Structure formats: structure tokens, C-alpha cells
Design a protein with these regions (language model features):
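Alpha4 helix (beta4-alpha4-beta5 surface) of REC/receiver domains from two-component response regulators
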Residues: 67, 89-106, 117
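The feature encodes the CheY-like receiver
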Residues: 61
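Acidic catalytic/metal-coordinating carboxylates
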Residues: 38, 64-67
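Short hydrophobic/Thr-rich beta-strand motif most characteristic of the beta2 strand and flanking loop
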Residues: 30-38, 45
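Conserved acidic carboxylate
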Residues: 13, 88
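Active-site residues of response regulator receiver
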Residues: 57
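Short amphipathic alpha-helix used as the core "switch/output" element in two-component signaling
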Residues: 44, 66-79
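Charged docking surfaces used in two-component/phosphorelay signaling
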Residues: 20-28
Length: 125
């Protein structure tokens, strides 16, 4: 018997308004969303239960998104299988996303429907 599809998405975003927008939009699309405001909270959450996908802001208050990914993958090798959707306003976001092996990249500002579509594709692949 096949298990239920993991639809849990970890959203890591320090801006309250953006985090709320992403979280509510993904929930409206039927995804199970958990949010973190910084890398420390995100690491605890990701280690407790592996998400199906991660929506990651690169610029976080306690450490940058690349440091979060490195620590997570170091402590949980199967994290390499989890697709990452980078959401960032940084000019170098595509280069950083490439280094992380991210599945998708969204700039800020972003079109909500496009972000939701990318996250849904990441979860299903």
C-alpha cells in the first residue's frame, strides 16, 4: 500500500507580510504549510519532520539561507532530495539558487500564482 503524498511545505521568510501571503496562498492551494521566521526555527522544524518542499528567503536575520541549507543537509542527508524554491529580492539570487541546487527561483516582488505553481510542481516531482 502506498503512503499518503507528503504535501508539507516549509516556508522560511522573515518578513511577516510576505510570509503570511505565501503561507495563506499555499494553504488555499491545498498544501500543508508550516512557517519559520529565521534559520534556527526552520532547522528545528525541518529536522523534526522532512518537508516535501522548502520555500526559502536567502536573507534571514540569524544566518543566510545558504547556511541553513548546509546545516540541514549536514544533519539530515535525505534533505538533498527536498526541492527548494528560492524567493529573494537579491540580485545574485539565481547564482545562489544554482549553488543550492534549487528547483525554482522567484524574485521579489513575485506573482503569487506563479509561486504557488512552482511550489506545487516541486511537491509533486
Amino acid at each position: 500500500m502506498q503512503g499518503r503524498l507528503n504535501r508539507r511545505v516549509l516556508v522560511i521568510e522573515d518578513d511577516n507580510d510576505i510570509r503570511r501571503l505565501i503561507t495563506e496562498s499555499l494553504r488555499a492551494a491545498g498544501l500543508d504549510v508550516v512557517a519559520a521566521v529565521d534559520a534556527s526555527q526552520a532547522l528545528r522544524t525541518a529536522l523534526a519532520r522532512k518537508p516535501a518542499a522548502v520555500v526559502l528567503d536567502i536573507g534571514l536575520p540569524d544566518q543566510d539561507g545558504t547556511q541553513f541549507v548546509a546545516r540541514w543537509r549536514e544533519r539530515r542527508p535525505d534533505a538533498n532530495e527536498v526541492p527548494i524554491v528560492v524567493v529573494s529580492g537579491r540580485a545574485d539570487r539565481r547564482e545562489i539558487a544554482s549553488l543550492l541546487g534549487a528547483a525554482y527561483v522567484c524574485g521579489k516582488p513575485f506573482i503569487v500564482d506563479e509561486l504557488v505553481d512552482q511550489v506545487e510542481r516541486a511537491v509533486l516531482n
